[in-house]
Amino acid sequence: QEGLNAALLYNDSQSGILQQISNLVPLNEVQTITLLSPYFDECGESLITLSQLCPNSTVNVLIHQDCALPPSGMLPNSSIHFYDFSETKRGKIAFKTYERQLHAKVLHFKTNDAEYCMVGSANATLAGLGTITHRGINEEFGVLYHSTKQDFLSTLGLKTKKRIDVPTNRSKHSNEAPSETGRRLRLLSAYYESGKLNVYSNEEIPDGVLLSID
């Protein structure tokens, strides 16, 4: 598309996604950051880092009210605001067959005359985005789009509407040891799709077994 530029971002041995973004986006000119993610650092480290890197900006975070890993330990920050993803145009799209779960990751920067929008695999966490000096520990990929004409948030249906407090229902993991009747399995992979968690193990999991992932 004319006027639309794109760059591939990924964590490599020399740099991370956030560092690569800093080389492509004029951070001091950013007026607004809009971020969509299903998972966050508990104390909001990545959100705070973005706010510090773009000192003239406001950070708008789109979050699901049932987010399993919200930044529930983050201290109040006048530059960071939270909005209900369910109240956006995209969030209101309903499917008849299953409850919709937020899995998308979008990081959008707006300056006075341009927009930059990254869509990819990285959550709003240090493990995904990394910092300016250190790459994240996860293997992540994303595409950063740049345009002086495109309104990315309108196109994606992600305009902020209803402001909310930070959700506090962060999942808690038990520190208790497994019962004597329990056994440990090595999980090869797991993914969530259409309201169903699919788990693959190194051995067959019998029917009727209660699986606890810690």
Residue ranges and their predicted role:
Residues 1-214:
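PLD/PLD-like phosphodiesterase catalytic module centered on the HKD motif
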